[in-house]
């Protein structure tokens, strides 16, 4: 246990367009080299494409996509007597959201469309309908945890 006091979480201001903290956090994750305006342009462009294609509120679709990508359990390595076990542990709420955002961005960047706006829009729409690589990543994570359920008693 650390002897110093717990570090406060930084308050993230809501984004200018949707007044939503989750979108602002996503923009911060998407941003590279401090270029926030570029990150905002990408995500707002992706939201416009989602709205045009699905004729639905893009914020609602985005939140549904995030919920579909959030992992419930993950595995952590734990060394016990010379052997390393993959121990399944439950994921905290804030880490779930962070992982979901990270995976959405990672698998968006790996898609085949031409611009990042199109890639992100495609991955958001796929994730909202339980398809796509980000959802597959969550399923793989859950499978790993399920396969290593026997080591759950090593949790710390």
UniProtKB/Swiss-Prot annotation:
Annotated CDD domains: uS7_Bacteria
Keywords assigned: Ribonucleoprotein, Ribosomal protein, RNA-binding, rRNA-binding, tRNA-binding
One Pfam family this sequence matches: Ribosomal_S7
One Gene Ontology MF term: tRNA binding
Keyword check for rRNA-binding: yes
GO BP, one annotated term: translation
Entry coiled-coil feature ranges: none
Keyword Ribonucleoprotein tagged: yes
GO cellular component, one term: small ribosomal subunit
Family as reported in the entry's similarity comment: Belongs to the universal ribosomal protein uS7 family.
Function description: One of the primary rRNA binding proteins, it binds directly to 16S rRNA where it nucleates assembly of the head domain of the 30S subunit. Is located at the subunit interface close to the decoding center, probably blocks exit of the E-site tRNA.
Subunit structure of this chain's protein: Part of the 30S ribosomal subunit. Contacts proteins S9 and S11.
Protein name per its UniProtKB record: Small ribosomal subunit protein uS7
Organism for this UniProt entry: Anaeromyxobacter sp. (strain K)
Gene this protein is translated from: rpsG
